[in-house]
Amino acid sequence: MKKLEVFGAAKLKGQIRISGSKNASLPILAATLLSNKKISLANLPRVKDIETMILLLKSLGSIIEDNKKELIIKNTKQTKTFAAYSLVKTMRAGILVLGPLLAKFGKAKVSLPGGCAIGTRPVDIHLQALSKLGVKYKIIQGYVHANAPKGLIGANIKFPKVSVGATENLIIAACLAKGKTTLSNCAIEPEIKDLVNFLINMGCNIKWTAKRTVRIEGVNNLKELDYSVMPDRIEAGTYLIAAALTEGNLKITGIDPKIISTEINILKKVGSKITLKKNEILIQGSKKIKNINIKTSPYPGFPTDLQAQMMVLLCKANKRSHIKEEIFENRFMHVAELNRMGAKISINGNQASIEGNIKFEAAELMATDLRASVSLILAALAAKGKSVINRIYHLDRGYEDIEKKLKKVGAKIKRIN
């Protein structure tokens, strides 16, 4: 099994270009199932979850050509509606093929999803909303068996709580439904806006009518499309935190600062000096890190996908900080490993109390999920000596060329068997 060796105490300095967004690419790839026309996608990150989604599309009959610069997808012979557990088990985004399969064929058998073990992530919201479009479903032996005998029919749907995945699935499904669908209490993450932009460019009729309300009118014909996926704001936030943690000096390029304004404002509050330019962020980490209290929440709030990384930074703050996790109920599994490195973090329900002024100690560590794995890399970068991180297959699900990018800005990091 592969591991990472990280030698700490280096100040990161240089430039990092941000890759395409994993969380935008996955629903866009699923949405290509709606069309029989050629679709070309550029700026896809080369990470494991994307590879898995490509394999899933191929298993459904998509013909896919990869020339490394772009992915060319044709669904002219795509007739299969069965998404197997063997492909869906490693990523929760597998459930996103349910909506387009039902929209196109009126039936689907899709395995319940896997991914990081950071909460139950129920698909009930997806299924209850799809039922309002005319879908009948049963869950049998870990599979969703769904069909729409009369096809999908537009409806007014209010999500009981904000859900990124359910918003994506329903927007995609409604694009081919009969009549109009109005979805309210939608998630409004930039990745969802990117999905909607992709769908509109493909010929779908979608309009935001309020901050969290979207109206979709079903269409019969879609167009060929060349599309470039947005940059990854979570990757950008991770490297900004790495700079703040190591007193580094980084230029982050290829991303609009507006989409991570919440994260930028928090980093300014803890002491980092940040300069914003068009598609560039310059950050200078401070020797003195100020404490702060944070809670995760749906966009435009602080993202749960940066909670673990931010926790590492707050271990170096001048006083105690608190983080309240309000998205997932089991997202503090990195705490035990950070405490083994000298952190003093205590958990009470969904709140973490983080003592400041910590000096991290190098250690052998075990990653538990995607974002936890990168938080351990950050802690190792701030520690003296050599740390070894096990189970880095989690990392490969979501970060493109992370060792290469970190090496380029001065980190001592290498992959070993």
Curated annotation (Swiss-Prot):
Q: Active site located where?
A: C116 (proton donor)
Q: Name one GO biological process term.
A: regulation of cell shape
This chain belongs to the protein called UDP-N-acetylglucosamine 1-carboxyvinyltransferase
Q: Where in the cell is it found?
A: Cytoplasm
Q: In which pathway does it act?
A: Cell wall biogenesis; peptidoglycan biosynthesis
Q: What is its main location?
A: cytoplasm
Q: What residues does UDP-N-acetyl-alpha-D-glucosamine bind to?
A: R92, K161, V162, S163, V164, D305, I327
- Per UniProt, what is the name of the gene that codes for the protein in this document? murA
PANTHER family referenced in this protein's UniProt entry, alphabetically:
UDP-N-ACETYLGLUCOSAMINE 1-CARBOXYVINYLTRANSFERASE
2-(S-cysteinyl)pyruvic acid O-phosphothioketal modifications at: C116
**Which keywords, in A-to-Z order, does the entry hold?**
Cell cycle, Cell division, Cell shape, Cell wall biogenesis/degradation, Cytoplasm, Peptidoglycan synthesis, Pyruvate, Transferase
Q: Where is the signal peptide?
A: none
- Provenance organism: Pelagibacter ubique (strain HTCC1062)
Q: Which chemical reaction does it catalyze?
A: phosphoenolpyruvate + UDP-N-acetyl-alpha-D-glucosamine = UDP-N-acetyl-3-O-(1-carboxyvinyl)-alpha-D-glucosamine + phosphate
Task: Outline what the protein does.
Answer: Cell wall formation. Adds enolpyruvyl to UDP-N-acetylglucosamine.
Q: Which GO terms describe its cellular component?
A: cytoplasm
Q: What class of enzyme is it?
A: transferase
Quote the NCBIfam families the UniProt record gives. Answer: murA (TIGR01072), PRK09369.1 (NF006873)
Quick check: keyword Cell wall biogenesis/degradation in the entry? yes
**Which superkingdom does the taxonomy of this entry point to?**
Bacteria
Q: What is its EC number?
A: 2.5.1.7
